[in-house]
Amino acid sequence: MKKIIFTLLFAVVSLGTFAQFEKRTMYVNASLTGFGLSYSKQPGFCMNIEAAGGYFFADNWAVKGLIGWDHVDAANTFDMGAGVRYYLHNNGLFFGTGFKYGLTSAGGDTEVLHNVFLPLEAGYCFFLNDHVSLEPSFFVDMCFNHFKESTKFGLKLSFGYYF
């Protein structure tokens, strides 16, 4: 009898835990990368801050928009983009992709670069409670027009709020 009650209790708790990935759920998140957790061909200190918001248009599928700021040595890049995210069978593992436009300026009289990126991301969503999550992920931002100089990859840490 104890096994049956425990099994039923576990089933009910696990169903409620991942209701965050259901259709019509919205989320916002903020992420941070750099500090030695990412690599690009450009030398020097690097840091990236990004804010994103999304909407689950179907169970486990979300569409998102993002804005970000990337600092590498003396250059600053402002990003904006859109993409999709897929959560595997309500277990928290996710994959994402999209398109990102970046405007890079090193200040002064230097040339302004216009870059188009294909971001790829894979990570896991740890829920701290019913709404707040911690989302570590591995990312690759492939640059179409300056591949060798502007492509970067690394680890990203995000905090999300699902409502």
Q: Model segments located where?
A:
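Aromatic-acidic/polar surface patches that form glycan- and anion
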Residues: 42, 111-113, 148
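N-terminal processing/targeting junctions
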Residues: 14-16, 38, 142
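Gram-negative (and chloroplast) outer-membrane scaffold detector with strong preference
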Residues: 22, 34, 52-142, 158-163
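A short acidic/glycine-rich loop-to-helix N-cap element
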Residues: 143-150
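N-terminal targeting signals for Sec/Tat export/insertion, comprising classic cleavable signal peptides
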Residues: 28-59
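Cleavable N-terminal export/targeting peptides
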Residues: 1-25
